[in-house]
A protein has these predicted regions:
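Beta-strand elements of well-folded, non-transmembrane domains
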Residues: 91-97, 112, 129
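Short, cysteine-centered beta-strand-loop-beta hairpins and adjacent loop/turn segments enriched
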Residues: 62-63, 92-103
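A short, structured loop/turn motif at beta-sheet edges
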Residues: 75-84, 99, 112-120
């Protein structure tokens, strides 16, 4: 389980850092359970494939550079073959409107569903955090 999840985290980081937003979207479940994204930038959760597709289109049109590096903090198997993961993600995004990079760190909680030998994200909750210098 852990090696497949670490591979998913690496793929997530690589695709974001390459601005392969379509590739990031492919890491998500598109069937059942319905995908859910909860992030600070939205007043309400995004639920379902259509809302996520609009989100990916917005993101792809607004970014010109990205760098993402995430660390898997924990992964727990839940009932029904589901997995809960906690990641610490350090990121830098530069929008199309300027050359100023926006950097930060976020805690991310994923719920994953097994699909063959891989996992797909069906729930992503992210909150930016301000950590002390030297925090691992």
């Amino acid at each position: 389980m852990t090696s497949a999840i670490k591979a998913l985290v690496s793929e997530y980081d690589e695709k974001w850092s390459a601005l392969d937003v379509a590739g990031v979207a492919e890491l998500w479940e598109r069937g059942t359970p319905q995908p859910v994204y909860i992030g600070d930038e939205y007043a309400a959760p995004l639920v379902g494939v259509d809302e996520l597709d609009r989100h990916w289109a917005r993101v792809a049109s607004r970014l010109k550079r990205a760098s993402v590096s995430s660390r898997l903090v924990s992964a727990d198997e839940l009932a029904g073959g589901l997995v809960r993961c906690i990641l610490l993600s350090r990121w830098s995004f530069t929008g199309t409107e300027s050359d100023t990079a926006h950097t930060g760190t976020s805690w991310i909680t994923w719920l994953l569903i097994a699909r063959g030998n891989t996992y797909r994200i069906f729930h992503h909750m992210e909150a930016q955090v301000y950590l002390d210098e030297g925090y691992p």
